[in-house]
């Protein structure tokens, strides 16, 4: 009965938002998107851990904060926080359900001696978050045959991209109390998986700025090169060839196997490809197909968010209007109307004080709801740069079991914060890579 009621409400909501008219202008769409983000706000979880790495036998202490997207405050919607600890193999160690009366909760996981070293994962979510970002892990069709029925396979491969997830190292239990060495005895996975011989399998992904390669435009393209196991490959030179095999540009992978290159005047119905060498083997990967009509984006940020738009040659008429919207955490921040006129390029500048610090989504769409370009960008207003709490009283060295007194002072006296989540740890075993 609950499912029937929910479906009926969803259909009625969909009719209110999109069923009144077949085509609506961009202002009306923006208002409805804003209403959707307000009426159905999303939640976001953050866990503050007491350390950056652990040893078998330790206890993981944590505090969880859950905010709502429309207000940017602690949530008052969900009352239960689910926190899961998973082994390096992906098996569930424990799931905790914590009462969350004011948007916060705290708990702990004990790394018992029966566990083993490796890279563990913490996941946290509310039931409300499971309504957003659901997807299915890519897998081969034959892998579903290992399950009794399709429903079991569907449950196994289902995941949610909106969940909080953090991976951290767990090292072997110290042989002597107090002598911590970062030794990690991994399980012998090689008895299950044998390394392939011959040509390594590599994964080269392309990310055109704006989402597509658009004919007749200058397109920025980012790429990422990884091994089959997910290792980032750095300092690999990659040549970009046109359909005739001529080299038109080149690039070299940098940090985390990533880099960018520019394709000038992208040809219609042309197939570009990337060629490179790795460990003496030759590789050739096709770039995404070229779209005949569309809009290319170039986004830059200094004191302003600067966006350059370039349309394809044949894309001239937008009877329902064209607009650019920036959205953060599911809530629209600003809307700019776009008018190319007789030109193929135009620019939009947005003051940073109109946006939120964090990941923002730029979308170019018309009054019919058709999306021409879509891109994520990180906006930094520097409102989180400086520490807001001064800590005094830390000595360079302490005697065993000596009492420690710390003085904490809030810098901004007008700040309304009433509580602090504080973690104290041994700096000798700190792991900066896995810091909060």
Model-based region annotation:
Residues 121-188, 192-196, 286, 415-436:
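Acidic glycine/proline-rich low-complexity segments
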Residues 76-86, 96, 107, 118-124, ...:
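Beta-strand-rich binding/interaction modules
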Residues 101-108, 254-260, 334-335, 341-349:
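Aromatic sugar-binding surface patches on proteins
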Residues 115-116, 126-142, 278-284, 331, ...:
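Short acidic/polar inter-strand loop motif in beta-rich domains
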Residues 1-28, 408:
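Bacterial Sec-dependent N-terminal signal peptides
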């Amino acid at each position: 009965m609950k499912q029937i009621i929910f479906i009926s409400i969803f259909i009625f909501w969909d009719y209110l938002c999109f069923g009144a008219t077949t085509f609506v202008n961009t202002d009306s769409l923006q208002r409805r998107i804003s209403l959707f983000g307000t009426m159905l706000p999303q939640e976001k979880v953050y866990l503050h851990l007491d350390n950056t790495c652990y040893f078998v036998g330790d206890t993981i202490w944590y505090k969880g904060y859950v905010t709502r997207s429309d207000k940017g405050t602690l949530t008052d919607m969900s009352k239960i926080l689910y926190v899961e600890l998973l082994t390096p193999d992906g098996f569930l160690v424990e799931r905790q359900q914590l009462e969350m009366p004011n948007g916060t909760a705290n708990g702990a996981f004990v790394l018992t001696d029966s566990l083993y070293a490796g890279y563990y994962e913490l996941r946290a979510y509310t039931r409300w978050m499971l309504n957003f970002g659901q997807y299915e892990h890519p897998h081969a069709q034959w892998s579903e045959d290992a399950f009794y029925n399709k429903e079991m396979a569907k449950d196994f491969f289902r995941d949610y991209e909106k969940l909080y997830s953090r991976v951290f190292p767990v090292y072997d239990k110290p042989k002597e109390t107090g002598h911590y060495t970062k030794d990690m005895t991994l399980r012998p996975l090689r008895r299950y998986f044998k390394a392939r011989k011959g040509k390594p399998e590599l994964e080269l992904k392309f990310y055109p700025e704006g989402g597509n390669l658009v004919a007749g435009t200058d397109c920025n393209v980012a790429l990422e090169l990884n091994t089959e196991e997910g290792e980032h490959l750095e300092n690999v030179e990659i040549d970009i060839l046109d359909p005739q095999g001529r080299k038109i540009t080149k690039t070299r992978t940098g940090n985390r196997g990533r880099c960018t290159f520019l394709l000038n005047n992208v040809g219609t119905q042309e197939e570009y490809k990337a060629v490179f060498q790795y460990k003496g083997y030759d590789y050739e990967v096709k770039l995404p197909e070229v779209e005949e009509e569309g809009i290319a984006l170039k986004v830059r940020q200094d004191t302003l968010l600067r966006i350059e738009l370039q349309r394809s040659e044949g894309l001239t008429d937008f009877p329902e209007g064209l607009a650019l919207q920036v959205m953060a955490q599911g809530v629209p921040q600003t809307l700019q109307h776009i008018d190319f006129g007789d030109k193929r390029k135009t620019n939009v500048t947005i003051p940073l004080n109109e946006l939120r610090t964090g990941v923002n989504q730029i979308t170019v769409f018309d009054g019919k709801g058709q999306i021409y370009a879509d891109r994520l960008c990180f906006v930094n207003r520097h409102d989180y740069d400086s520490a807001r709490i001064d800590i005094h009283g830390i000595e360079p060295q302490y005697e065993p079991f000596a009492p420690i007194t710390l003085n904490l002072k809030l810098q901004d006296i007008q700040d309304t914060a009433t509580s602090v989540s504080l973690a104290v740890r041994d700096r000798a075993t700190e792991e900066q890579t896995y810091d909060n």
